[in-house]
Amino acid sequence: MIENNICIVGLGLMGGSYAMALTKAGKQVTAIDKNSESITYAEQSGIIECGKTEDYERLLGEADAVVFALYPHAFIDFVRDNQKYFKSGVIITDVTGVKSNVVEPIQSFLREDAEFIPCHPMAGREVSGVEFADDSIFKGANFIITPTEKNTARGLDFAYNLAHLLGVFHISELSVEQHD
């Protein structure tokens, strides 16, 4: 089973495609993005229930899971600056393609009652923006989970269930070093 209330941070192609797939699966999906036009488009298109560009503390506090679709440095900064709003027991994951520069930094400061399970869907297109969101990009794709010693059975279960919900073709587990 996958958590019901999921917040997507970063509504580009990947974040929007995750949101679309999760919404179609009946999850309550909210989003945070710096671009108000992206939020408006996603709300009006039914990709998300609601979104914010600022004053998003409530969205983070209500989320059972948070998916980060940001560049690595922005991902690290966002978690560092906003983890105080995460609910206890939250699972966070990402879509970044290089793990060595995000996993250790995030895990070095992440609260003890939050879990980061690194993931990388091997999917995408040569376009960007939520207006190109398409949950079918995951069909036939590989999905890599890079668990660490800090991950629990619950976190791994979340990652596998997320991958199945997205409809990926193959799921593999690799170490951070093997992935990069």
Describe the function of each predicted region.
Residues 1-58:
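NAD(P)+-binding Rossmann beta1-loop-alpha1 motif at the extreme N-terminus of oxidoreductases
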Residues 2-5, 89, 140:
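Phosphate-coordination loops involved in phosphoryl transfer and adenosine-cofactor binding
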Residues 7-8, 68, 145:
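Hydrophobic Val/Ile/Leu positions in short beta-strands of Rossmann-like dinucleotide-binding domains
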Residues 34, 70, 95:
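Short beta->alpha hinge that forms the Motif I/post-I loop of the SAM-binding pocket
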Residues 36-37, 97, 150:
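Helix N-cap at the beta1-alpha1 junction of Rossmann-like dinucleotide-binding domains, i.e.
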Residues 56-86, 90-91:
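Rossmann-like NAD(P)-binding element
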Residues 80-130:
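Rossmann-like NAD(P)(H) cofactor-binding subdomain of soluble oxidoreductases
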Residues 137-180:
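Internal alpha-helical scaffold of NAD(P)-dependent oxidoreductase catalytic cores
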